[in-house]
């Protein structure tokens, strides 16, 4: 954490910096070529996210000193967003309680103040313990933890029909118990994650998943326990501050691309198979009319600022611990293009862009937007008050 200045208002900038395993890739290279085979890479652009936030914090500090204005700037370094998260723990410890508002951004393929929020999530390891036995000679003496895991999966698959359409249940085997099929496995672990638009919906669905796990243990004569590994609140952008950031984005405009940038972006877009391109076009349909999309993809770097809709009620299906900050202080996360239109996240292509000139240009524009938005907000106490009243309507007066 970096802090400077004094007095009110207190501005928070959020940074992330974790990479993703297996996504090592040479900077700006449109052919898959890892720097280190199997190594980590910034497939979500957090190197840009963190650098942009820090640049904004330093620029705002210099502005306050030059103009002899009151105000405190706090830069929050937030690890592990791709895993268990950290912002919810920072919020729970009260570090956002005295922050008047917070701004952050995320590398994307379009330029916008995201009108849509993101969903809440909760994850846990389910641990089953049974009794080992010879699977051929004495199976009746065994109690299979692996069978319990399998039955839990069956139960959760039936549960999918009886949950809201917007909910999701994901799972992955953490420890199947062993590799010998002639052993009744006495230990097995499976990880589950549950998503839904609101925290209350996640909690309700997670309780049902736990009940399924209990049933699986009962059917197999095993014992079950679970350990919660992560939980993020849903993210809803503060509509009052979203309008401020949107205006600043329109004043500064999109990153300034060159013909070299456009050609490189087109090379990356050609790395995707036809089936993926169909999905990319569908995704971009949210931003472009059909007649606009073909023209946009001829030079596939976003050149416009897409509209901010403060009345938007839809949400993306992803999750972020920025949601927990949004329940503690008025928060806005916006997007700036750092990759070709429609580029797939968590990919080697995204790592290549994150370390390219295209990525750097997007990051610097994001830093300028955050700095200007912070200055504008600090100069308008009435806007801060309105944003905080909006927060109160959402959280009831305190971080849950």
Question: Which role fits each region the language model picked out?
Answer:
Residues 269-367, 386-400:
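Zn-dependent metallopeptidase/amidohydrolase metal-coordination segment
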Residues 15-18, 38-52, 104-110, 131-140:
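Histidine-centered catalytic micro-motifs
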Residues 98-275, 281:
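Midchain, well-structured core segments that form catalytic/ion-binding scaffolds
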Residues 8, 56-75, 156-166, 379-384:
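Phosphate-handling active-site elements
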Residues 48-118, 178:
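Acidic/histidine-rich catalytic neighborhood of metal-dependent amide-processing enzymes
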Residues 1-42, 51-55, 59-71:
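Acidic/His- and Gly-rich active-site-bordering loop/insert found
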